[in-house]
Amino acid sequence: MILTEQQKKRLRGLGHKLKPVITVGTGGLSDSLLAEFESSLEHHELMKVKVSTGDRDERDTAIRTLCEYSNAQLIQRVGNIGLLFRKKKKNSKFAAL
């Protein structure tokens, strides 16, 4: 699902008050972290991820890897926080999008 700019703007507004659900530390993206990320994204649909590793390129790579792994879309990235979205197939809170 490709989101329009209006939809992304709405999701950014909804995501503003959220706190990061997953934190990627210096250990990077382990299998257990990816599994936890997948289950959290399935539950929340819209969530923040904090990436506390290295420089900007490493953070970009980690967020891009999470998006590719889970088929999520990056809505916004500010510093070391990424806002990711993946709509549920059934019973989505974001059915109007």
Regions flagged by a language model, labelled:
Residues 1-97:
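Positively charged, polar, low-complexity stretches
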